[in-house]
Design a protein with these regions (language model features):
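Charged catalytic and DNA/RNA-contacting regions of genome-maintenance
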Residues: 1-193, 207-362, 371, 378-391, ...
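Conserved phosphate-binding elements of NTP-dependent enzyme cores
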Residues: 3-7, 14, 567, 574-577, ...
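ATPase nucleotide-binding head domains, primarily ABC-like/P-loop NTPase cores
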Residues: 29-30, 261, 331, 342, ...
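Active-site phosphate-binding and catalytic loops of NTP-dependent enzymes
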Residues: 79-81, 104-113, 282, 418-424, ...
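Amphipathic heptad-repeat alpha-helical coiled-coil/stalk segments that mediate oligomerization
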Residues: 235-239, 298-304, 310, 314-315, ...
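C-terminal tails and terminal domains of large nucleic-acid-associated
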Residues: 886-921
Length: 921
């Protein structure tokens, strides 16, 4: 047995081998050490008496899925080795085979899957300046590919990979340096030969990682998942194309949009091959592949997704305060995944967006229809993943029942949609297949409430199989049959004392006394002679015995055969089931958006092909849900001419960042197909939303907060377009005042003036000097978030109005934060001195300026604006330096005033002078 284990382990290095022994999965040698540690189970040993004990640990087979899930979530690959023959039918070592390898990117068991999130396996490859990537969710069959060419190709593909957030990324070993450059990680190479020679690196975190192990993407700032290098020979273009052609059963890949997309084809083939090898199955449910380009959807990079808190809140304690949580009213897993996809990749096609708006509008208007649809959809299972399990050979009895129950709801759903006017809802209705044949097959063959596992028996309905019914009857009625047979033999032989008995040695036999032995019929076969009795058997008894003793075993075997046959029959209708699943998912998503619109008072936006972005009384969709007071709505107007750069000033905590974020969220909601939180909205179709908000460092890459800020800003300046929306919040605050102001000024000016980069921009800042730009830039406008003072306290009004703010009210915010009164008093004193000194400097500068104007000094409008901003900044800096010097030395002045020279000795005066000298700045 140990030799068998070692042979299988040698065929699957880089995995933890779950070796089936009876009712347990056992791990041996190093695998046992790792398994015991990671699963926190007892580590024991085999052959202790020999002096060379073999470490081992094990888990019960009935709960193994949970243990496997723990290991895979930690980055391990698990090879599942099963007994593939009946131990009772062989005297040799039972045959065992690895039936599946579970990796982070190829899970199909529910314990390893998030019901409301996709689980992607990704692959990336490159030739020259062409880079291809593919994304496969083996649990549902969703398959996508893309390709980029040129100097920026790696950045573009890296952005796609970030967006899809794969659990595992495959790549050629030779690309390790580029992977490191693109994702900030250093993958190591190794080998994991699979069935056809597929080679991946070995797996296992922590110390295992130091020896040819995988590298977790959590070491990178942009991805979380497992990096898996594969041998270069597996990435041959010709072989890859033929693999896909054969799998899809076509003559060419041109129909999938993959013509002349060599790198995309190679990446897609790598994904498919890896999935087939790990699952030991053909993956027939992967029946299509979609080629996409970045311009096919509104681009939201990971920075924007994080900053806008689209799917996850930034604060650990605010995990539920993300946009997706607020708008997700879906009632099926597949609907939830589709809604999430719409949010992360909104459409840029007006027809598609307005079709979703139309569906939401109809469902929004009909409360009864919407509630009835949601009630029916709640009974629909995750048909996408259920179909995946059917095709991968891992479906359970209750999966088929769930499929039947789900399909039973389709006629009702179709009836509800029949009288609607919306084009999209009619298309969905036509896509719904009632699959009456599949429903009938399952209803006639599978019990309504079968056990969880097939081996528990009782899965196949009575009446479906005559042989199975006979076996069950035989098993249930064994005692009655024995009594009837015994009575029959007594009557036939005339021996009243004849008995039919059973023991473990001879099985069933007929026993008669010695006195009656001569009266037995001639067809009786002697089995055993005892002192006072004879034991016989008959052909009929032997036949019945064989049936009874093998009935339970045969029942399970026959049920398994019938169940497998039914699964194969249902799987032949995969295309029809998937089409219905997609339609139900879409219906769930638009119904969810309608429900959200009703609950949150959202309105239908007007989409257009122009450049005007107008939101009237817009609200932040997340903040308004979680605050205890009425949300203050604000209106925003942007275009690409007169209002393309809005410079927003205002107090801390006033709501500048909220206005920025809510504007972007409203645009994203509209383009995903949702209604929006506003009184009204007229919106253009954006190509990308850029954000530079918040403060964060990247110590793993040696990047400071300011470096991260500048890197993100540089990406915006290089890639923004007139169709983009840019949010800039406090650019330049991470460095010295003059440096920061200079950078902020230049960034705003660049976005305004550059014809190819003049995106619609919201620029929030505390550099009030930037408000001077609005006087010379034709497309710049000043806005402020208002506040007022009442009875000595600041009241934040949170209203966005035209104009520039004069104060930041930072000390008031510090008071609200709980700063000690003494510190607040000192801060007010310092501020008063700074402001007084600034006014003095300003008065002197005004006199100089007036003198210069009197002698005819002139300057251009542009120079004047920049000069005023520079003067204001210089005045602030000079005031700070001079006044702070005075404040710091105030203690010295106070001590000198209190000193009385007439009463001091020479030594005391000398000591005081020395102490004061040490205090001078």
């Amino acid at each position: 047995m140990v030799r068998q284990y070692q042979e299988l382990k040698a065929q699957h290095p880089g995995t933890l081998l779950f070796f089936r022994l009876g009712d347990f999965y056992e791990l041996f040698f190093d695998d046992a050490v790792v398994g015991a540690r990671e699963l926190q189970i007892t580590l024991t040993a085999r052959h202790k008496e020999r002096g060379d004990p073999i470490p081992m640990c094990g888990v019960p087979h009935h709960s193994a899925a949970n243990y496997i899930a723990k290991l895979v979530r930690k980055g391990y690959r698990v090879a599942i080795c099963e007994q593939t023959e009946d131990a009772s039918k062989t005297k040799k070592l039972v045959r065992r085979e690895v039936v599946r390898i579970v990796t982070p990117g190829t899970p199909i068991d529910p314990q390893l899957l998030e019901p409301r999130e996709s689980t992607f396996l990704a692959a990336v490859c490159a030739r020259g300046e062409s880079v291809g990537a593919a994304f496969l969710d083996i649990s549902t069959g969703e398959f996508r590919a893309t390709q980029a060419h040129g100097a920026e190709s790696w950045k573009r593909i890296a952005a796609d990979i970030e967006s899809y957030a794969p659990r595992e990324l495959l790549f050629p070993v030779s690309l390790a340096p580029l992977i490191r450059a693109a994702f900030g990680a250093t993958p190591k190479t190794g080998s994991l030969p699979l069935k056809s020679g597929l080679r991946a690196q070995e797996t296992g975190p922590e110390e295992n990682q130091t020896s040819d192990s995988h590298l977790s993407m959590t070491d990178s700032a942009s991805l979380s998942g497992t990096l898996t290098p594969l041998d270069d020979w597996l990435w041959q273009a010709d072989d890859s194309e033929q693999l896909l052609i054969k799998h899809f059963g076509v003559r060419s890949l041109e129909g999938f949009g993959l013509a002349k997309k060599g790198e995309a084809i190679t990446a897609a083939a790598a994904c498919l091959r890896y999935a087939q090898e790990t699952q030991r199955a053909g993956a027939a449910h992967v029946a299509d592949i979609l080629y996409f380009e970045p311009q096919d959807h509104l681009v939201l990079d990971n920075i924007t997704v994080r900053n806008l808190e689209l799917v996850q809140a930034l604060g650990a304690s605010d995990s539920g305060r993300a946009l997706l949580v607020v708008i997700d009213e879906t009632v099926t897993g597949m609907g939830a995944r589709l809604l999430r996809s719409w949010l992360l990749r909104p459409s840029v096609h007006r027809g598609e967006v307005e079709a979703r708006h139309g569906a939401v509008a109809e469902l929004h208007a009909s409360h009864m229809e919407r509630d009835a649809l949601r009630a029916s959809l709640k009974e629909v299972a995750d048909l996408e993943r259920l179909t995946g399990r059917l095709n991968l050979g891992s479906a359970m009895p209750r999966d088929l029942v769930a499929l039947r129950v789900s399909l039973d709801r389709v006629p009702t759903i179709r009836e509800l949609l029949a009288n609607g006017d919306c084009a999209l809802l009619q298309v969905l209705n036509e896509s719904l297949d009632e699959l009456a044949d599949v429903r009938s097959l399952i209803a006639s063959s599978i019990e309504d409430d079968p056990p969880v596992k097939l081996v528990d028996g009782g899965v196949i309905r009575n009446g479906y199989s005559a042989e199975l019914d006979e076996l069950r009857s035989l098993s249930r009625n064994a005692k009655q049959t024995i009594a009837a047979l015994e009575a029959e033999e007594r009557a036939r032989s005339g021996i009243g004392s004849l008995r039919i008995r059973y023991n473990n040695v001879f099985g069933y036999f007929i026993e008669v006394s010695k006195a009656n032995a001569a009266r037995v019929p001639p067809e009786y076969e002697r089995r055993q002679t005892l002192a006072n009795a004879e034991r016989f058997t008959t052909p009929a008894l032997k036949e019945w015995e064989a049936k009874v003793l093998g009935a339970e075993e045969r029942i399970l075997q026959l049920e398994s055969e019938i169940f497998s046959l039914i699964c194969r029959q249902v799987a032949t209708e995969t295309a029809r089931i998937q089409a219905t699943a997609r339609a139900l998912a879409c219906l769930d998503a638009v119904t969810s958006l309608a429900e959200t619109a009703v609950r949150r008072r959202y309105v239908r936006p007007t989409m257009h092909d122009g450049d005007e972005l107008e939101v009237v009384h817009g609200r932040h969709p997340v903040i308004e849900v979680f605050i205890d007071e009425p949300f203050v709505p604000n209106s925003v107007y942007l275009n690409n001419s007169t209002d393309r750069l809005l410079i927003i000033t205002g107090p801390n905590m006033g709501g500048k960042s909220t206005v920025l974020r809510q504007t972007a969220l409203i645009c994203i909601l509209a383009q995903m197909g949702s209604f929006v939180p506003a009184e009204s909205a007229r919106l253009p179709l954006l190509d990308r939303v850029w954000t530079r908000v918040g403060a964060s460092d990247d110590l793993a890459r040696g990047r400071s907060t300011f470096m991260v800020e500048m890197t993100e800003t540089a990406a915006i300046l290089h890639n923004a377009t007139p169709r983009s929306l840019v949010l800039l919040d406090e650019i330049g605050r991470g460095t010295a005042t003059f440096d920061g102001l200079s950078i902020a000024w230049a960034v705003a000016e660049y976005l305004h003036d550059s014809p190819e980069r003049c995106a619609k921009t919201l620029f929030a800042t505390h550099y009030h000097e930037l408000t001077e730009m609005a006087e010379r830039l034709p497309g710049a406008q000043n806005y402020q978030i208002t506040a007022t003072e009442r009875e000595g306290e600041v009241v934040f009004l949170h209203r966005l109005e035209r104009g520039r703010a004069s104060k930041s009210y930072g000390i008031e915010v510090a008071r609200l934060a709980g700063m000690p009164p003494a510190a607040l008093a000192r801060a007010r004193e310092v501020l008063q001195r700074l402001e007084r000194y600034e006014l003095d400097v300003f008065a002197e500068e005004t006199q100089v300026a007036e003198g210069a104007m009197a002698v005819g000094a002139t300057r251009s409008t542009e120079e004047a604006a920049l000069s005023r901003a520079t003067s204001r900044a210089a005045r602030r800096r000079l005031a700070a330096q001079s006044s702070l010097f005075d404040l710091a030395n105030q203690k010295i002045v106070d001590e000198l005033r209190e000193a009385n020279p007439e009463k001091m000795s020479g030594e005391e005066a000398k000591q005081l002078l020395s102490e004061l000298k040490d205090q001078v700045m």
